[in-house]
């Protein structure tokens, strides 16, 4: 039944039937926790890996002892960094110790290692003044993966890949002759026995003795032409280092360094964990028949007798007592199973070692050696600490390789299983911390080389750590990562939801990931292991579909980087749903049977039905209650935040829900935000976690509230907390950030209470659009193809008005001819144009500007021309004439207008940091109020998008029986074929709720059903079908049929017509082809392509066609002459030769063809290089204005149209797209 729920300061009527168990985690903890780990542990790991750096003689030893981020000496606050274009960072100080072994002298110093970018509380970084987000990357986890293919004859061929975190890959494959090959580090394949020999099993007999009798092994030995360990080593060396003289010693050291050297080969913690999980012997012997007695080597006790079945517990016991080889019986054959000899340390050490913090399995032979040699608790613990890298090796060991070969052999007997690489148990997340750690490691290893070189060069007596260390490579690699990595993205700040989603994004692209072109369908597909971890709905349309995903609402990332999702434990004894919550990774989840969250249970947690619908791996089954082990915790745990904000998601087709999720992120913040009448209840959580709203840091009482500051007196010590509110700031996307207080003086606030609303929030709930009275009705064809008809009331009352702020900057530089100057004194500019310019030459705040108006007056010195003798004489007599300058003022670009809201001035004198060569920098901010207009794109939350086709006067809109006119008319044909019925249910419920004065929460998969909506309509006094008679506003006659009318939540999207509309008469031309550029940013023309030419040909419009292909495009002389004719009012002259024809001839000549152009009399026509001498004579500048009205390519353009589009690898600039105006010619003086 519908019940009230308190959400922040608002009460919503909720239709949910389920009691939520467990809290949703903080939605940006992916970012915060990861960076936190990096500062606490990640940095230390890198230093540990590189310690100590020794010189080549082994005499000098440099060690990093400890480090600290100096948080007290941060230069600027976050806000100041944004204003000054600087990076929010803290200095990293590292304590370094230098030991000279000959003299025994130790020098310690604290060395500054560069400024380290800090994460803000919102999970972002400020890099050069721009707010950026580091997107988490989904990559294949290191480990060993087995695969199976079936060949032409129908036999199964198995292959395997051993993937480290870094280092050489090992790949096994079987051919149709049953020979097993290995590739080492992607080289040519060798029989696998060569590898086994090289690792220590030299003769055929030893190999068969160790691995057991096997047909494939024998076939491989036959193929193998080496017979001893030495031969095998030389063979491998020849393959890996062709052309070098092979010796046994060099071959041995090569294999050692390839696989068994922690600096060259790193499995990482995850890799070791996955290896031990896959190769553990207990998994492969469970439920098998023993072929020999299995005896505990310590006690001599028989664990399993020959012919007995091994159960799961016995198998684990066998592994943990150090047994690594077990014979089992398969189809009357004996097969030897070999593990990698890792055991659970807790089952072997007789006392508690939880303080050692060892969670992984450890290598048994090393542990046994420690336990055999030491008896007391303290020394055993001490030895374990000392030998931790031998117990848990970071690199692969011989036993691992033997176990992988044995697993490969066992697969043909159905022992073990093949892996699915798209399973989330085999893909992990690399978040900020790890990505940064890898980058830092690269920087440090570059630095290590420098340090070693300096150690050998410098005098060992006077050497200091400071003199050895060069921090440049470290600083450069960090800077490179934040500035240009594909995963470091300009934050999508259109609204709070787009910020939040950007921080929770998971990308499979980027360095070390996939590339768009290579990614097939399997990787992009929805997988059963995504349930509760990755949203199946929210992903971009286009080339990135399925490669960029979003984290599900309840998901967390564990220490290994695997995504976990929570489940309720079902008590195994009485099968009652408990409130214990267990987080599980995808491969753990596969072992259990899991019921859905909306399975009916009574108030004590017992299942009401005898049979229950469950998920088991990829299957959905119906099983008796006794088999259920876990239960989902919430119906919305499988979707992302944006998707969970679509009401009635369960009634929408998936592809439309996808558009709905994506379009909510493009909603522009409106002047007066309004929370949805029909919400889903997650709006408050999303807004509070997005980081755009100020929260109380401590509990207390509000003592002062104004538009831009709130003060709270703390309860704890009576001190005052001040909160500055952001007023009309520009976001990354040019939308407006403005915060408004929602607390009043005297109000008592708890810790974490919201104090103010931000952009697109209303009482702390995300409010992306407006509740609009609409009807599904066609009107005179203005609804055709999803177009929308809107009422003029929406324009008059500023319902969909938004504020947009653009930033423009002018810098005064030093040029060869002298410094540029910012001044009010500009040549050839009348007083009228300077009316809003102050005495400094800068526009005043509050001035209204249109395109072409001066924002900052600036003059640049012109080159002196050669003077004649007479002029020199006059100059000498009358003194220096004023030097020539030209006007290079910053003007409002074409098509822009608005009001100046802020001006910032940075100069060298004030001590501001400016780029070299810049003396003064002025930034102007122009705000525009954009009302809704024809051509703007609007959308609902169900993927129902459209463009406004007409703004109709209020009195002409269809109206209700009570006289209220509709605000929007939508096409009823937009619903049935698209199958997003959620919008219809939303409209009905919205109608009833607005009459009842309710705000509604209808959570996804647990919301209102049809009968609930009918009840609400009845309660509100409307007809049960939600339809009503509508009257035509023009005639007052009723329409023929009753129409569905109600309230729909509608968003205005960031595709505004003002940003797209564009017109050009003349402007810049491309350098080579001399054709006009394309696109609004280049102030380009409209493309007249091949098909358009056909159209004119078909009409026989010969003159129009000739004109378009010549004077309107690339006939350089013709276009000047035409312009002249128009100016002088004469007839248009005949066109000349288009430049592209000359380019074609040049291209043919470049192919060594002698091409001549002949006339009718076979006379050669000389094509002269067309120069604009005619233009100079005319003094007509048709190359656009001298300061080309090119919009300042803003910082955000670097992240192409869709912010999900991770930037392509560096794109070569297309020469044709560069126009002369694009080159910065100021640096070349005035020769041009």
From Swiss-Prot:
Q: Where is the composition biased (Basic and acidic residues)?
A: 1189-1198
Region Disordered: start-end pairs: 1170-1232
Description of how the protein assembles with itself and partners: The RNAP catalytic core consists of 2 alpha, 1 beta, 1 beta' and 1 omega subunit. When a sigma factor is associated with the core the holoenzyme is formed, which can initiate transcription.
UniProt-listed InterPro entries: DNA-dir_RNA_pol_bsu_ext_1_sf (IPR042107), DNA-dir_RNA_pol_bsu_external_1 (IPR019462), DNA-dir_RNA_pol_su2 (IPR015712), DNA-dir_RNAP_su2_dom (IPR007120), DNA-dir_RNAP_su2_hyb_sf (IPR037033), RNA_pol_bsu_bac (IPR010243), RNA_pol_bsu_CS (IPR007121), RNA_pol_bsu_protrusion (IPR007644)
Any Pfam family the entry gives: RNA_pol_Rpb2_7
Classify the source by domain of life. Answer: Bacteria
- From what organism does this protein derive? Clostridium botulinum (strain Kyoto / Type A2)
- Enzyme Commission identifier(s): 2.7.7.6
The protein's matches in CDD domains, at most eight in alphabetical order, are given as:
RNA_pol_B_RPB2
The UniProt entry's sequence similarity note says: Belongs to the RNA polymerase beta chain family.
Biased composition annotated in UniProt, kind: Acidic residues: 1171-1180, 1199-1232
An example of a Gene Ontology BP annotation on this entry? DNA-templated transcription
DNA damage: present as a keyword of the record? no
| Name of this chain's protein | DNA-directed RNA polymerase subunit beta
| A single cellular component GO annotation | DNA-directed RNA polymerase complex
Query: What GO annotations for molecular function exist for this entry?
Result: DNA binding; DNA-directed RNA polymerase activity; ribonucleoside binding
- Spell out the coiled coil positions from the record: none
